[in-house]
A protein has these predicted regions:
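Long, positively charged amphipathic alpha-helical accessory segments at protein N-termini or as interdomain linkers
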Residues: 2-12, 97-126, 137-282
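N-terminal lobe of the biotin/lipoate ligase/transferase fold
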Residues: 1-120, 276-282
Length: 282
């Protein structure tokens, strides 16, 4: 290990620079072209600019560092240089606007599968999708997805799937250590970021276009199997709703059964797991 590597400044050419060759060897349509930069404000913003200037379906923007990366509801995405995967994929799907919100779950499945592969078969059940856009390992966030889109008439002109995966980091700020993790911290067996990237792109290529055309039906069983909130006591962070997660419907809505047996379909917002004591009381 070089002095630079010891300080987290991994050589770009030795790691992510292999990604185009791996993507090409797998014959993937997504990830080509792959635009790689050391630092950018936001890969989603880069992808939007590319979309407006005619970049093709599958074009992907990847950065070692983001200065203005964000998640849902404008949250800042913290990512030390060289530790993680930060990328955005341009998807020209031509689907109705109603098909866009569930795509964050489809992207979540692709990320989940790639993370589970990197951790090894023994950890497959530990990696789950948390509605609407997170991937967790043993209850801690390892990845997040931000899906954005633009309309052209009644159709979606393009979708941007922005993805951040904590891969190599072995330490986290104190305020995050209880709620976040990385593939490395969970004992990952394959820490090659280029391989993880290609695995995610392969999953997106397999599922996203079909989901945009036909809905969640083809992935619903897998989504149900890896649903982080199923059977768990949950509460909304921005409304009085509290109850038990009881699945995700074919429209991508979270189903929550309240104490009186009513099932509420949640289309937007954020839910968190309730503490065990609170769940027993409520």
């Amino acid at each position: 290990m070089t002095a630079a590597e010891e300080h987290g400044e991994r050589a770009f050419a030795a790691d992510l620079a292999r990604a185009p060759a791996i993507i090409a060897a797998r014959g993937l349509g997504l990830g080509a072209p792959l635009v790689v930069t050391e630092e950018t404000a936001s890969t989603n913003d880069d992808a939007k600019r590319g979309a407006r200037h005619g970049s093709p379906h599958g074009a992907t923007w990847l950065a070692e560092s983001q200065t203005a990366g964000r998640g849902r509801q404008g949250r800042v995405w913290i990512s030390p240089r060289g530790d993680n995967l930060l990328f955005s994929v341009l998807l020209r799907l031509g689907c109705p606007p109603a098909r866009v919100p569930p795509l964050s779950l489809v992207c979540g499945l692709a990320v989940r599968d790639a993370v589970a592969k990197a951790l090894g078969p023994a950890h497959d059940a530990d990696v789950v999708v948390k509605w609407p856009n997170d991937v967790l390992v043993r209850g801690k966030k390892v990845a997040g997805i931000l899906v954005e889109s633009a309309l052209s008439g009644a159709k979606v002109e393009y979708v941007i799937a922005g993805i951040g995966i904590n891969v190599l980091g072995r330490s986290l700020p104190d305020e995050l250590s209880a709620v976040a993790t990385s593939i490395a911290l969970e004992g990952g067996v394959d820490l090659d970021r280029a391989v993880v990237l290609a695995d995610v792109l392969a999953g997106l290529e397999r599922d996203v276009a079909l989901a945009a055309e036909r809905g969640l039906g083809l992935v619903h069983a897998r989504l149900s199997k890896h649903d982080a909130l199923a059977g768990r006591a949950v509460e909304s962070t921005d409304s009085p709703l509290r109850g038990t997660g009881c699945g995700i419907d074919l429209e991508g809505r979270l189903l929550v059964r309240t104490a009186d047996g009513t099932v509420t379909k949640v289309t937007a917002g954020e839910l968190r797991l309730r503490p065990v004591t609170a769940a027993r009381e409520g």
